[in-house]
């Protein structure tokens, strides 16, 4: 069994890779779902500013690995079926450290890479509550880079380029996941 921690900038294509993993029978845990749940629990709207405030506030209050720590019970529950697991949305070095401590050699980090212009186009085309406009997109990029996201992307063991078509990403992601399944 392998555990993949997926990282990348917003709208790079992590969700698409997670969907492909699910189609292959992998279990998927999306870290962002925990942030959304906490935002809703506080009675806040799922808007870019409130989701970002909650994510950042929890990191400042409890440490930058907090969302990974809160993810461990969910991930461990998914592992009981013996399935491969994909963690969607690892955001920084502290989260990576939590996952490495928990899963050791079974963990493989994968970065999904896409140009800023490509990602902005995708944000403007998709209908996600936490995306917002171009200004919100750039603010989110800066906020997430402040969580050491760039360093986490650079440290990834594997990369998936996603500046082409969706079918190209699907083909490349499928091939990478197949390769990781045979580890």
Model features per residue range: what roles?
Residues 9, 21:
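P-loop (Walker A) phosphate-binding loop of NTP-binding proteins
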Residues 27-98:
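ATP-dependent small-molecule kinase phosphotransfer cores
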Residues 15:
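Walker A/P-loop
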Residues 12:
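ATP-binding Walker
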Residues 28, 109, 158-161:
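Short, well-ordered beta-strand core segments
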Residues 88-89, 102-130:
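Conserved phosphate-donor/acceptor-positioning beta-strand/loop module used by diverse small-molecule
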């Amino acid at each position: 069994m392998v555990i993949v921690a997926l990282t990348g900038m917003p709208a790079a294509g992590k969700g698409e890779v997670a969907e492909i993993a699910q189609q292959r029978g992998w279990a998927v845990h999306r870290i962002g779902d925990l942030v959304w749940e906490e935002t809703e629990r506080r009675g806040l709207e799922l808007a870019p500013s409130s989701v970002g405030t909650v994510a950042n506030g929890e990191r400042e209050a409890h440490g930058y690995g907090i969302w990974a720590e809160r993810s461990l019970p969910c991930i461990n529950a998914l592992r009981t079926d013996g399935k491969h697991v994909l963690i969607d949305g690892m955001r920084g070095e502290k989260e990576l450290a939590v996952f490495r401590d928990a899963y050791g050699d079974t963990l493989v980090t994968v970065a999904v890479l896409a140009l800023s212009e490509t990602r902005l186009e995708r944000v403007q085309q998709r209908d996600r509550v936490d995306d917002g406009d171009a200004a919100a997109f750039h603010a989110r990029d800066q906020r997430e880079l402040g969580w050491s996201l760039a360093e986490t992307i650079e440290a990834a063991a594997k990369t998936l380029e996603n500046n082409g078509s969706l079918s190209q990403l699907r083909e490349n992601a499928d091939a990478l996941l197949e390769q990781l399944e045979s580890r």
